[in-house]
Amino acid sequence: MSIEVDWAAATSGPDGEALAERIRSFVHDKFQEITLPRFIRSVQVHSFDFGTIAPDLEVKDICEPFADFYEEEADDADTSVASEELGHELHESPYEDDMTYNPTAHNLHSFSHHPYPGEGFQPSALRSPLGDHLNPHFMPRASTPGIPGGTSTLGYHMRSLGGLSGTQTPLAAVAGGTSFASGWSDSGMGVGPRSQAARPAGPHHLAEPDLDTTNSTSRPSTANTLPSHPSLGHSGSSGSNPHTSDPTDAPQPSIETSDDPAAEGHSLPIPPRMRERRPEDFQVLCHAKYAGDVRMSLTAEILLDYPMPSFVGLPLKLNVTGITFDGVAVVAYIRKRVHFCFLSAEDADALLGSEQSQGSQNPSDDGRPRSGGDQKDKELKRQGGLLQEIRVDSEIGRKEDGKQVLKNVGKVERFVLAQVRRIFEEELVYPSFWTFLV
């Protein structure tokens, strides 16, 4: 199902201008955080414009929102809205809450950014290797009684990976026809069994057949490891008196030190607070194609090293005149918030890969089979990322007698455009997303 977007109404007016200025300021601030090469002194972003060409949107699926969209921020500035919603949830229906909403209390384009958590950030429940709210559509595992967290090494490897992609993402569950709200009956995924497994086992919890007191060679000696408890090593010795009734000669469970931080008393990361799901929450997956005239103006100052290092700086003006985009957009509506992001190429293939492969096998419009070159071009575009093409015009220096001093400085162009592509894919591609208050 295709959607026609009134692009002029959505991007014009005071709200559209404010949103364009926020995007310009955001991209400009990101360039100030980038380590520039030696031949570039600074990069400035001067303007951003949405253009006049609207994207083509085709609805692929309507499903339940991703679990990440329900996470509550610790520094959420919209505490008044949350308290108001809580009061309505206790005494009124959600439909009455929408009817009593005051539209003047919020700005249409007030938004917050949720970047992908790196080092020093709390991982979300969707990617948390040990959290109780781990999405069951990833890799369910069973917990081993007596061992906190089970014997799985998934948490060790996922700390370095940071996230999952491909068929291990929530999109794989959507493509498979399953629901995000459904849970697993695995005992290792619940809060109760996990807390029970994390408790230290007492002597009455130990199985007696596991304690071998007849063969001293079947286990390592504890005489050197625990010198303060000589009875532990003496009980398993073959030279002990079998007729003594001293209770210290009875076999005692050995105390072993564990390298697990959870066993040493270190607290595990606190799982984020999750908002309650509502029946009216929904999420739309759209196939978005865009070949428009979005414009952005940047200036990069180039340093010349002749006749001495950093002798003079020349301004290089870059004008982005349009982009070509092909990807899957995610729009989730939860209460008075709209969450927006794009999916990576791997996640998009999990949903649209079968359709694209079928399209390559179907004949073309003139009845002839499609050539293999067209399929190769599609694969190359898919490997290039969501932004398939960025059209740019550049000029350097001042104009003298109507002629430019230099044109098309390729090295600077490639660097700046690569950073624009990186900022887009890191800040707008899931698991990063943007939240708008509506």
From Swiss-Prot:
**Disordered: annotated span:** 110-154, 185-277, 353-379
Annotated GO MF terms: lipid binding
Q: Which domain of life is it from?
A: Eukaryota
**Cysteine disulfide links:** none
The keyword Mitochondrion is annotated on this UniProt entry: yes
UniProt-annotated location(s)? Mitochondrion outer membrane; Endoplasmic reticulum membrane
UniProt domain SMP-LTD: residue ranges: 1-438
Q: Biased composition, Low complexity: where in the chain?
A: 227-245
Identify the Pfam families for this entry. MMM1 (PF10296)
Instruction: Name the Gene Ontology biological process terms.
Output: mitochondrial genome maintenance; mitochondrion-endoplasmic reticulum membrane tethering; phospholipid transport; protein insertion into mitochondrial outer membrane
Could you confirm whether the keyword Transcription regulation appears in this record? no
Q: Name one GO cellular component term.
A: ERMES complex
Please state the protein's primary subcellular location: mitochondrion
Question: What is the membrane topology listed in the Swiss-Prot or TrEMBL record?
Answer: Peripheral membrane protein
Q: Where is the composition biased (Polar residues)?
A: 212-226, 354-364
User: Keywords for this entry?
Assistant: Endoplasmic reticulum, Lipid transport, Lipid-binding, Membrane, Mitochondrion, Mitochondrion outer membrane, Transport
Q: Where is the composition biased (Basic and acidic residues)?
A: 365-379
- Which family does this protein fall into? Belongs to the MDM12 family.
| Subunit-level organization | Component of the ER-mitochondria encounter structure (ERMES) or MDM complex, composed of mmm1, mdm10, mdm12 and mdm34. A mmm1 homodimer associates with one molecule of mdm12 on each side in a pairwise head-to-tail manner, and the SMP-LTD domains of mmm1 and mdm12 generate a continuous hydrophobic tunnel for phospholipid trafficking.
Q: What does this protein do?
A: Component of the ERMES/MDM complex, which serves as a molecular tether to connect the endoplasmic reticulum (ER) and mitochondria. Components of this complex are involved in the control of mitochondrial shape and protein biogenesis, and function in nonvesicular lipid trafficking between the ER and mitochondria. Mdm12 is required for the interaction of the ER-resident membrane protein mmm1 and the outer mitochondrial membrane-resident beta-barrel protein mdm10.
Q: What is known of its domains?
A: The SMP-LTD domain is a barrel-like domain that can bind various types of glycerophospholipids in its interior and mediate their transfer between two adjacent bilayers.
Designated name of the protein: Mitochondrial distribution and morphology protein 12
What is the species of this protein? Penicillium rubens (strain ATCC 28089 / DSM 1075 / NRRL 1951 / Wisconsin 54-1255)
